[in-house]
Structure formats: C-alpha cells, structure tokens
C-alpha cells in the first residue's frame, strides 16, 4: 500500500450511526448495527445530496496526507463491544434512544438528554449577567438570609461546608476586611444556589452571582488550588448540574476533579509517600466530604453523557462520621456501587444482580437521597437489561417499590420548590424502564410517573420540562400502537381458526377426559358470544 494513501471513509452513513456519532461502513446493514442489533436505516435523499456534494468537492480536493499511525494497543477497550454496551446502558439518554428504536424505528425521537434537569440552560432573564463584587449585589442581611436557605435545603444532602466559616467570612467581607478572592466565589455560589432553590423564576441577581463566581474561579485557575477555591468550583458544578446543559456541567466537573488532585485533597495523608499532600491544614471530615460529593457528581454527569469520568490516581475514599440532620453519608455510601459501573470494568450478570440486591435493600431517608438511590437502581437495571436479564418475582417487586418511592420523592421536591437536578430526570427514566420491563405490574405504575412529570412541567414551565413530558407521552403511544398491532394479529388468527366444541360421544373415554371436554365446551360456549371487535379492545387494555 502506498504511504501517501489517505484514510478511507464511507461516504454513506446510516441514520442510527449518525444519531450515535459512530463510524459507519456504509453497508446495508452496516457492521455497527449488526453488532449491536440496531435497525439500519438510510436516508435516501440525504445520501443522494451528500454523494453529489462529495463528487463536486473531490474535483478540487488536494492530495491526501500521509496516514497517521495510531497505537492499536493504547486503549484496547475503546472498541470492545462490552465497553460500548456498558457505556450505552449507563447513559439514560442512550437507553431511551435504544428503547425508542425498538418500539418504532421509523418514528423514534432523536438521542437527547431529555429531562436531564428542569432548565437545560434556559434559566435566563432579558438582562446580560454582569460580574460584580458580592458586596455590591447583596447586603450583609441579604447574604445571611440566602445562606440560611442554602444550609436548610442543600447542605443536609451535600454537606461539605463549615457553616461557622461562612458566618465568619460574611462578617469579614461586609466589615471591609481584606479577603481571599476565592471566598467571594464561595459566597456567590452559595447565594446563587439559594436563589435557584427559592425562586421558581430566575432573578437577574442569581445570574449575576453565578457569573461573578465563574469569573473569579476561571481567573485563578493558574494559581495553586486551595480548599476555598475547590469549594467554589464544587458549588459551581452543583449549580450547573441543576440549571445548565450537560456539556457545560461535565466540563466544569472535570476541572473540579483536577483541582482536587492538584490541591492534594483526593487522598488521605501518608507519611510513607513522597507525593505532595495538601499544603493547607485541612479537616479530614471536610476533605472527605469535598472529594465524595465531587466524585458523585462527576461520575453521574459522565455516565449520563456517555463520556469519560475523571479517575484520579492514588485517590482514597473513607467515610466521614455521621452527624444529626446530615444525609451526605447516604450519598457517599452509594459511591462504591457507582464506580463499579465504570464501562471499563467487566462484570457478569450475577455480580450486577448482587449489587442491585444490596442497593434495593438500603434505607434512604429524605427525597434527594431516595432519588440518588433510585437513579443508581435504574442504571443497574439498564445494565442488566443490556445482558438480556429479565426481572420477575421478588426482585421485580423491589424494583417497582424503589421506582414508586422515586416518584414520590420527586413530587415532594416539587412541593418544596427545590429543583434538585434529578427531580425531572428520575421520573422520566422510570417511565423508560417501566416500558422496557413491559409487564402488567410495571405498566400499572406509568400513570403515577406521568402525573409527576406533568406536575414538574406545570410548576417549572420550561421547554425542557415540556419536551420531556411530550417525549414520555410519545414513548407510551409508540408502545400502545405496538401492542395494538400485536393484539390485532392475534385477533385475526382467532377469527381464522375459531374455537369448535369437542365431541363427547366417545363412551369409552376416561372420566377425567370427559370432565376436561365438558370444561372446554363450557368455556367455548362462553367465548362464542364475544364480539371480536370487543376482543381487540380487551387484548389492548390487558396488555397495556
């Protein structure tokens, strides 16, 4: 082969590979769709136009560049079917897309992070956000009031800030004392989250606060990270996960993890290691909480998007002590099960079933913690379903019990007007799982989940919540039509082969056989009065 020959690409790509951004070989069906059992569909009009454009461009195209040699053994798991299967199962968006393709390949909605949060970047006002000193935006009383809201609504679940420290830096800042600029980022982050968790509609103040925090944090990125700076970044990630787009939150979360590592906050201090540890004297409880909450957010943002999470070398995770009124420990205890779902790790169905059983038996106390438990359960179920595992008996009962608790937790959060990032995502993903399980028991729970999603769209009336509600309705409609088609096919067969009574004239037939014949004839007589149009409706309702 000539060394000047460029890399060959297919000029055609099927719609499935386009949606999933995969390399397509242009065959019918293509190799990727065959491997992962997708429906391989080509858009003829698009392909014709692209072929015409490609031919025109090739006339003036320069000579191809020499091929770039890549070490095939550098990351062997990238092309592994198991890795891709796990990556898709971890992502709620990819699971939704596969479910939609299974129900109706022609009309399946595009792959999108529906309901990832209630806003998806739409929490805006007509005014352009401006970065300003926190003392120009708030009075001391205003800052203290917003701090109260933060410590009431968010700190019990994500407890990583010393409340007394916030009181001290607030007092110092409004007293005119010289403060670390990163402290302003922390105050702005707390105040912005408090606004988000107390106001249904965004205020210009909220957007100015988050813009001011962003400006300070990004301006100081070249400095050696401090605990205060890392705290400011974590507050920013929490806000972005709750109100912004997935990509923005993922980028900030990745930066946060690297900041943790650079500050030496990702591992327990050790006298045996020569690696640098945190230069500041950091309370071990605070350090563990900072790392755990950061890792929790980074893992699930990455899983949701189907992207790489940030894995820190030499990181350690030790549980902090429990304290009254704090539920952060419940979130942290889920982390080992979350990290085990990394797509690079290989688990068989038995191992995942054991993890699912353990998670299902856990007791979580408050709505946000219950939704975290439910979210992990949903992911484990998706992973098992990707291995063609079915749920029956007690396991199915436990799964449906957790999903029902997840729906109730989401409703409690709506009532509290505290838009936790999983408020809309968990009910939407519950609907997807219920449709995928596809039993009478699972489908019976759909109404509660849809009502919850509708309530979210009513309170937080955004394009994101309305699109999530409409998409969930579309999925259910697709399931209904699929079942109606199956019911119609069964009905046509019954019409073609009607039930005929058995003859009872065989005198020598055993007594048991005679009883069976009478039972069958009685049943046939009862069914003979059925209108087959009624049978169509009967089958549709019982199956959906």
Curated annotation (Swiss-Prot):
The keyword Metal-binding is annotated on this UniProt entry: yes
Source organism, top-level taxon: Eukaryota
GO cellular component: nucleus
Primary location class: nucleus
Cellular location(s): Nucleus
Renumbered residue ranges of the record's region Disordered: 50-71
GO biological process terms, semicolon-separated: DNA-templated transcription; response to xenobiotic stimulus
GO molecular function, one term: DNA binding
SMART domains, sorted: GAL4
Residue ranges: DNA binding: 14-40
InterPro entries: Metabolite_Synth_Reg, Transcription_factor_dom_fun, Zn2-C6_fun-type_DNA-bd_sf, Zn2Cys6_DnaBD
Pfam families: Fungal_trans (PF04082), Zn_clus (PF00172)
Keyword Hydrolase listed: no
Keywords for the protein's UniProt record, in alphabetical order: DNA-binding, Metal-binding, Nucleus, Transcription, Transcription regulation, Zinc
Function statement: May act as a transcriptional repressor of multidrug resistance genes.
Protein name: Protein RDR1
Organism from which the protein derives: Gibberella zeae (strain ATCC MYA-4620 / CBS 123657 / FGSC 9075 / NRRL 31084 / PH-1)
Higher taxonomy: Eukaryota, Fungi, Dikarya, Ascomycota, Pezizomycotina
């Amino acid at each position: 082969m000539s060394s000047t020959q460029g890399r060959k690409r297919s000029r055609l790509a099927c719609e499935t590979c386009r949606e999933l951004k995969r390399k397509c070989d242009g065959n019918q069906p293509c190799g990727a769709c065959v491997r992962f059992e997708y429906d391989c569909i080509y858009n003829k009009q698009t392909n014709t136009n692209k072929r015409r454009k490609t031919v025109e461009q090739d006339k003036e195209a320069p000579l191809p560049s020499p091929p770039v040699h890549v070490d095939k053994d550098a990351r062997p798991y990238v092309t592994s079917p198991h890795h891709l299967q796990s990556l898709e199962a971890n992502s709620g968006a990819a699971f939704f897309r596969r479910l939609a393709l299974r129900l109706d390949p022609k009309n399946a909605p595009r792959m999108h992070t529906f309901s990832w949060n209630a806003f998806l970047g739409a929490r805006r006002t007509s005014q352009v956000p401006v970065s300003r000193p926190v003392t120009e935006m708030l009075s001391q009383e205003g800052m203290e009031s917003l701090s109260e809201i933060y410590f009431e609504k968010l700190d019990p679940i994500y407890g990583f800030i010393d409340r007394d420290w916030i009181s001290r830096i607030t007092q110092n800042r409004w007293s005119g004392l010289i403060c670390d600029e990163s402290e302003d980022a922390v105050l702005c982050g707390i105040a912005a989250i408090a606004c988000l968790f107390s106001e249904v509609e965004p205020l210009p103040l909220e957007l100015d606060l988050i813009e001011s925090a962003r400006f300070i944090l990004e301006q100081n990125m070249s400095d050696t990270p401090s605990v205060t700076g890392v705290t400011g970044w974590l507050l920013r990630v929490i806000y972005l996960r709750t109100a912004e787009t997935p990509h923005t939150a993922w980028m900030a979360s990745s930066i946060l993890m690297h900041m943790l590592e650079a500050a030496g906050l990702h591992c327990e201090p050790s006298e045996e290691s020569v690696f640098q540890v945190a230069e500041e004297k950091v309370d071990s409880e605070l350090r563990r909480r900072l790392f755990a909450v950061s890792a929790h957010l980074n893992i699930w943002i990455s899983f949701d998007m189907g992207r790489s999470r940030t894995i820190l070398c030499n990181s350690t995770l030790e549980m902090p002590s429990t304290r009254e009124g704090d539920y952060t420990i419940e979130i942290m205890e889920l982390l080992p099960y979350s990290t085990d779902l990394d797509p690079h790790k290989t688990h068989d169905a038995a191992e995942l079933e054991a993890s699912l059983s353990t998670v299902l038996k856990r007791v979580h106390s408050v709505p946000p913690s219950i939704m975290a438990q439910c979210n992990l359960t949903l992911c484990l179920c998706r992973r098992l379903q990707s291995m063609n595992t079915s749920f029956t008996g007690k396991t199915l009962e436990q799964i449906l019990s957790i999903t029902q608790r997840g729906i109730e937790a989401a409703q409690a959060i709506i009532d509290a007007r505290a838009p936790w990032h999983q408020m809309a995502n968990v009910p939407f993903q519950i609907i997807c799982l219920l449709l995928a399980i596809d039993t009478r028991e699972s489908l019976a729970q759909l109404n509660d989940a849809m009502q919850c999603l509708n309530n979210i769209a009513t309170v937080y009336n955004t394009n994101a919540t309305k699109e999530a509600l409409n998409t969930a309705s579309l999925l259910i409609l697709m399931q209904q039509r699929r079942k109606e088609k199956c019911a119609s096919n069964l009905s046509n067969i019954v019409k073609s082969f009607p039930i005929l009574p058995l003859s009872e004239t065989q005198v020598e037939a055993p007594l048991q056989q005679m009883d069976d014949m009478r039972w069958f004839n009685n049943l046939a007589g009862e069914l003979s009065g059925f209108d087959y149009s009624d049978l169509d409706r009967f089958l549709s309702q019982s199956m959906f």
